[in-house]
UniProtKB/Swiss-Prot annotation:
This is Adenylosuccinate synthetase isozyme 2. Pfam families: Adenylsucc_synt. It comes from the Eukaryota. Keywords: Cytoplasm, GTP-binding, Ligase, Magnesium, Metal-binding, Mitochondrion, Nucleotide-binding, Purine biosynthesis. The keyword Metal-binding applies. IMP binds at residues 40-43, 65-68, 162, 176, 255, 270, 334. Its main location: cytoplasm. Binds 1 Mg(2+) ion per subunit. The gene is ADSS2. It comes from Sus scrofa. The active site is at 40 (proton acceptor), 68 (proton donor). GTP binds at residues 39-45, 67-69, 336, 362-364, 444-447. Plays an important role in the de novo pathway and in the salvage pathway of purine nucleotide biosynthesis. Catalyzes the first committed step in the biosynthesis of AMP from IMP. Its cofactor is Mg(2+).
Length: 456
């Protein structure tokens, strides 16, 4: 071979690879926290725990339709678009290309949290935004509301969206008419022209929509000045973080597995991939850099809005879970529907995400029950089905097979180790582990940081 002649050392290389460079996976691994049910599992709390010694905390998908609550020093912070890990003053927060950003919402959220306590001081210097992230405009949000109204009028039911413009902006993205952060900060004249075209498209689709185009552009110019120092090439930033000195990088998933656009209970889902694949596409990183994948599971099941919910308890049990768990959406304030834990759903979420461990939250909400049911199988026409149905009509028809476990009927909110939990509470956790074949790493028994019991 000519190459071998010009490179005599090549012949001594193993496998006869003639000195060709070989790509080897390397670099830091990212730790991922994902919701395993329909959202509101307590992801923010797990992220808050892990963010205490993290260097970078990332958001990879969704927008300000998510809602995370974190309590630090008795101050309750609410996050929708910002990674909740930004509460740690030593953390760099990164909003990836898969996230959709409503600029007024971003600044409003930051300013509200700054007024609550010291957790967000200096946030503007600690936030990096991918230049490839798409922008949510006010008319996307207005169109979201109109679409919901139309669904209600035409079909008698809507999707129960948060009306934050998430569906419309992802539609613009897929239609290649959306605008990104790089457009805003690089060439405002070019951005303005494209904004006018997009706004006029929306006005022609929704004749009742009123858009003050010049007024909007004036506002956006003001936001552009403020946001410009935060906008960076996200792919390059993350590559440097992965391949530079050792760093702890945390990814905070928004929404949850059963709300995923592909794998969720479609059409009652969000518009992004909130399963593990969305981490790679939403940040611009290869799958071999994904390390631990933690699934966050509430000790029972909740869902906001309409859609199939096999283990729902539309009765006193559901009401007790709702009031004890204070089940109201952080983003919408809507009451959450409540039911027993569903292991069929969790096995399905695990098939997609490959959870390495679980965080089981709000176990203390079950303190009042003398017996607790867990959904272990679905039956259709009297036969057990081995999968989680994709079709909503089919999912609505399944009959859940339950396993009844004895409750502990005692307050566990002061437990700080696994051994301090009553035996029946320990058995409940072990039953979940055995059925799912995934270890439980944390158990939540209250709202504060201290009330997360770590098992290993």
């Amino acid at each position: 071979m000519a190459f071998a002649e010009t490179n005599p050392a090549a012949s001594s290389l193993p496998n006869g690879d003639c000195g060709r460079p070989r790509a080897r996976p390397g670099g830091n691994r990212v730790t991922v926290v994902l919701g395993a049910q329909w959202g509101d599992e307590g992801k923010g709390k797990v992220v808050d725990l892990l963010a205490q010694d993290a260097d970078i905390v990332c958001r990879c998908q969704g927008g300000n339709n998510a809602g995370h609550t974190v309590v630090v020093d008795s101050v309750e912070y609410d996050f929708h678009l910002l990674p909740s890990g930004i509460i740690n003053p030593n953390v760099t927060a990164f909003i990836g290309n898969g996230v959709v950003i409503h600029l007024p919402g971003l600044f409003e959220e930051a300013e509200k949290n700054v007024q609550k306590g010291k957790g967000l001081e200096g946030w503007e210097k600690r936030l990096i935004i991918s230049d490839r992230a798409h922008i949510v405009f006010d008319f996307h949000q207005a169109a979201d509301g109109i679409q919901e109204q139309q669904r209600q009028e035409q079909a008698g039911k809507n999707l129960g969206t948060t009306k934050k413009g998430i569906g419309p902006v992802y539609s613009s993205k897929a239609a290649r008419s959306g605008l990104r952060m790089c457009d805003l900060v690089s060439d405002f004249d070019g951005f303005s022209e494209r904004f006018k075209v997009l706004a006029n498209q929306y006005k022609s689709i929704y004749p009742t929509l009123e858009i003050d185009i010049e007024g909007e552009l004036q506002k956006l110019k003001g936001y552009m000045e403020r946001i410009k120092p935060m906008v960076r090439d996200g792919v390059y930033f993350l590559y440097e973080a992965l391949h530079g000195p050792p760093k702890k990088i945390l990814v905070e998933g928004a929404n949850a597995a059963l709300l995923d656009i592909d794998f969720g209970t479609y059409p009652f889902v969000t518009s992004s991939n909130c399963t593990v694949g969305g981490v790679c596409t939403g940040l611009g990183m290869p799958p071999q850099n994904v390390g631990e994948v933690y699934g966050v599971v509430k000790a029972y099941t909740t869902r906001v809005g309409i859609g199939a919910f096999p283990t729902e308890q539309d009765n006193e049990i559901g009401e007790l879970l709702q009031t004890r768990g204070r089940e109201f959406g952080v983003t919408t304030g809507r009451k959450r529907r409540c039911g027993w834990l569903d292991l069929v759903l969790l096995k399905y979420a695990h098939m997609i995400n490959g959870f390495t461990a679980l965080a089981l939250t709000k176990l203390d909400i079950l303190d009042m029950f003398t017996e607790i049911k867990v959904g272990v199988a679905y039956k259709l026409d009297g036969e057990i089905i081995p999968h989680f149905p994709a079709n909503q009509e089919v999912l609505n028809k399944v009959e859940v097979q339950y396993k009844t476990l004895p409750g502990w009927n005692t307050d566990i909110s002061n437990a700080r180790t696994f051994k301090e939990l009553p035996v029946n509470a320990q058995n409940y956790v072990r039953f979940i582990e055995d059925e799912l074949q995934i270890p439980v790493k944390w158990i939540g028994v209250g709202k504060s940081r201290e009330s997360m019991i770590q098992l290993f």
